[in-house]
């Protein structure tokens, strides 16, 4: 019935001293060394889907890297910093902190279509370095649009759904709601009921196709 927020950006990080510093260089390296890059993610979960879409966009072959289990952000940061895995994702603030101590290499960020270096800086409250540029800003045609939806039981009357949606749209103008989303580095936008349904259908179709291509879909 509505969209709570549009999700937020994730930093894509590599081990310190990695032979690639941005997405284009990562793409070239993977193509030249198929099967050698190790990506830490939640196998069968959201972050594997995220990286599958990224690697597919970079190389045309989502299976040209090795995906290994590494779920928590703490584990990802620790293992990337130690060089145990080559690539992972993490929050922008954590990437900033580890990068400042030269523990990781920041390749860029992946987030919703609305994400830019400028508005990400506004979200996290710091001036982000150019190394945090989004996939789109680096010329890579992929985004990670993961809306947080508000759902209602099946057969809920449209007038009730519309009323809930209107309340959510008004919330996007409330300062405490804005501040809360800023603290989580997530984007908000007022999306009407019809556009919300279309957004969910489009996102579902994309994820379904991606998961099916990975052989992870269970009927």
Cite the ranges covered by each PLM segment:
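Ligand-binding pocket segment of bilobal, Venus flytrap-like solute-binding proteins
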Residues: 36, 40-129
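Short aromatic/basic micro-patch
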Residues: 13, 89, 129, 151, ...
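Hinge/capping helix and adjacent helix->loop/strand transition within the periplasmic-binding protein
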Residues: 1-75, 79, 135, 147-180
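Residues at alpha-helix termini
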Residues: 58-59, 102, 138, 184, ...
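C-terminal lobe and pocket-closing loops
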Residues: 95-172, 202
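A generic short alpha-helical patch detector that favors 3-5-residue windows
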Residues: 43-47, 139-142, 199
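Residue-level detector of anion-binding/catalytic polar loops
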Residues: 86, 141, 187
